[in-house]
Amino acid sequence: MYSHNWYLELILKDLKKLGYNITFECLNAVDYGVPQNRERLIVVGHKNNFSFPRKEIKRVCVEEAIGDLMYTTPEDSKFLTKSQDEYIAKYEKASCCKVPRDLHPDRPARTLTCRNLAGATSDMQRVKLKDGRRRRLLHKEAARLQSFPDWFEFSGNETEKFNQIGNAVPPLLAYKVAIAIKESYYDLCTQNTNHHYSEQLTLLEAI
């Protein structure tokens, strides 16, 4: 069901030893308002009943997230060379790729990773411009597709920034899960007047 099952089993075993009930599920960020297909296993240890947030009916597409950016060519744009375009064409033909791996404005993006943001030509996240040229994603575009707000600042050089974006759990997905945890904890606190729970509840007030 999951890769690295041994690691999941270890986490579950240790959480159970600490007295937690365990709920885990593979969530796709696209079901929670993130304009990207991104499956991640989320494990929650709790002392009360817990349910993951309900999936949202409407999915956000690429154009809704970066429509104002994806056909622009800022000074720091990095365009694919002729040899890269030729390599991609051969790669997609050899791998029987029916749909080019460019970003499609009318659908969610495929999973963003460190590798396809900053590295491999064949798997590169890229935008096809109206004049036929293709360029790599900008940091701002990649961040939006991960649901980061425009004001969020990443540190380091270009590769380091892409690594931070590619490795991240989408903030919007994390927020939706945090809200569900908060609701579960509120229910627990109403059932238990223990001072320990009241103190911990203050940590959730900012959510």
Question: PLM ranges: what are they?
Answer:
Residues 6-12:
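Charged helix-capping and loop-helix junction motifs
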Residues 30-34:
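Short, conserved secondary-structure transition motifs
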Residues 13-26, 36-207:
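S-adenosyl-L-methionine-dependent DNA methyltransferase catalytic core
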